[in-house]
Amino acid sequence: AAVEEQVTKIARTELHGGWTALRLHGPSSLDVTRLDDDTLQVALTEGTVSARVRELQPGERIEIDTPQLAVVADQPGEYRIDVDPRADTTRVTVHSGSATVYGEAGQSSTVGTRQQIVFLGRALGVAQSGQLAWRDGFDQWVASRDALEDQSRSARYVSRDMPGYQQLDAYGEWAQDPSYGSVWYPSITISDWAPYRYGHWAWIEPWGWTWVDDAPWGFAPSHYGRWAQIGPRWAWVPGPLAPRPVYAPALVAFVGGGSGSTSWGISLGSGLAGAAWFPLAPGEYWEPYYHASPRYRRRLNHWGDARDRARPPADSFYFQRRPHAITVAPHDQFDGGDRRSRRPR
């Protein structure tokens, strides 16, 4: 299903897909119509979107569709698209890079660095063209956001292709550990905090049960890497630097086991049936409970020895016998996406 983003008159918002940052200036309406390893395709029906394409691999496609045309980035660069539905126009601005614009009948036109063209209708009629002379307030805001990303400390330790890496800078600190290499310590003020405790579970196809973290920095550490406890502190361990990290819905193990349905189970002190889980430690194997290729499994479990490894015994996980790391919830709260999960007493 498409992801839709609505922006009000004075609002600005930011989306990331791989190496590309999309920023909207209201009022705007944007649908993400395709997002996979090779394609980021969005549809802008009104308003303004800026696209910063940091890297473009062979076979990769970044496309912005409007009611009048389609814009495809030919190389890394900075692009801006403005749609006026009442005038039936799309303005294409290329601050750097180069883009090909396609009309309804297959017509095409190239827009190069510092060029700006206003296209009328679906046949690539040109209403106005020229060289870019100045940047407005939105362009300046985009440039400031790009500068922050350029200076990101977290980008030294994880790939920019990892969604959510930008939030790590403001909410924690990086360090080097002799056992794990680069680790990230979140700034935590909750006394009983543990990974995968403050948030909720949601059923998301095709992954199945997926962890949705409450923390603004929670996406990357919930879906990539592993967790360790170094002294009294929790540390996120991203693992070996990979150009394209592999997503997982939640890198946890459940007490009692389980699959795409909640077949795992424990008995809570109240007599209710419940679910319990804990984070995987560095080097521990995660087995997808949805269909996944051997290559996906290898890339997901790329710690140390690159050879295939069998799934470990259910009682061999490091955090399984450490109650402070285990989180529990009654089944009705788990299935209902309730945030009231807790540590066992």
Regions found by a protein language model. Give the residues of each.
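Low-complexity, repeat-rich tail regions
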Residues: V118-R345
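Flexible, surface-exposed loop/linker segments and immediately adjacent secondary-structure boundaries
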Residues: A1-V101, A105-Q116, R145, Q151-S152
